[in-house]
Amino acid sequence: MSGGPLEGIRVIDQTTVVVGPICSRTLADYGADVIKVEAPSGDLLRTMAKGSRNPGMSGKFLNFNRNKRSICLDIKKKAGLDVLKKLISTADVFVSNVRPQGLARAGLAYEDLAKDNPKLIYCSIVGFGKGGRYYNRPAYDPIIQSVSGVAATLHRATGEPRFVPMVMTDHTTGLIAAQVIGFALYRREKTGVGEAIEVPMFENMASFVTSEHMGACTFDPPVGPTGDGRLLSPYYRPLATKDGFITVGPNTNDQAFAFFDAIGRPELKTDPRFDNAANRTSNAEAYFIVRKEGLLKKTTEEWLKIFEEKDVPAQRYNTIEDVLDDPHLNEVNFFGSEEHPSEGKIKRTRPANTFSGGGRISQSHAPRLGENTLSILGELGYSEAEIKEMVETGSANQGN
């Protein structure tokens, strides 16, 4: 990588599936040299996701692992484990979503690694934080959606417990992990020493949910029930127009009054249910019904033009297919095309955020399993004979 704010930072990434790879992809997108350490079987996401041209290179894996290099090590073998420890001794950051007791058994606890690398930032992404009864239990996204209350919010909104059809707890926790790694790197600049970070999925998502839905139970004793009634309303969704759907968000008084004018209901500006933000919140369901009825009068494009002129927040309802061809995303070059060395032409996204002080971050393809094993071993100072022996004994693999 070059030109990003994390240029010069080396990250050893011992993570799999989504939560960890999202964290390390974020660091890689902004310039870090991320070395993905994989077992001989490879990251589970290589094969568990549908959609691929070749085995072990699913579309999801390609999306979550761009801008990284891959080294394939069997750390059950001493030589493979020694390579991993040597890699970590050269790193600024080590990030893993292996459960802590497994890391400790392998001699990969923070206390073990900090002896050789006291400046190491050691990030452990776990399901549940230390000190609680769930610590060391395995966790995946639906487990955390269930226990954190995410599924319960959908139950209250739709009438049945459901998961958000995205791995949102993985995405959210992965992004938070990248964020706190940045905080730790900043502190290291001031102190000169590293530290261990624990990033628990459950606690982070419990914070996410309760920030919105603890509401009246913030007070002791509670002054009302949990839940944001506006967000849990069955009308909190895209609403139908004459020919499709649209989402409108008239929250301020100016926006709400402009919306009432647009739908031909100016009298609602003085209706005591809707004349200020507090009253609109208290009468959220009635406010949604007004919007629902008003929006049926015109087409989506007609409404978008009217709302743009009146500065009322509104946007079209996009299908996933629409997103892939959204004119705004095309204008900002969000999607690009890449010739992958083994997968051929693929569509890819770019990092969403930009920095005025940095150059354009170079983009490299998601690696095949063990694609960079030999070159990384060479960087670590291993001789050709040593590398050959590691490959022959299966301690290191060139992959495929």
Q: Model-found features: residue ranges?
A:
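N-terminal helix-loop segment corresponding to the beta1-alpha1 unit
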Residues: 1-190, 368, 374-400
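Terminal low-complexity tails and localization/encapsulation signals of metabolic enzymes
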Residues: 1-10, 234, 240-241, 322-400
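Short, well-structured beta-strand/strand-turn elements
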Residues: 34, 308-322, 383-388
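Glycine-rich beta-alpha junction loops
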Residues: 41, 127-129, 201-206, 243-245, ...
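Short, surface-exposed loop/helix-turn segments at secondary-structure junctions
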Residues: 47-50, 215-226, 326-340
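Conserved Rossmann-fold dehydrogenase catalytic segment
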Residues: 130, 158-168, 189-205, 224-231, ...
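Oxidoreductase and adenylate-handling cofactor-binding alpha/beta cores
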Residues: 174-194, 207-218, 260-267
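Aromatic-enriched alpha-helical interface/lid elements that frame and gate functional surfaces
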Residues: 234-310, 314
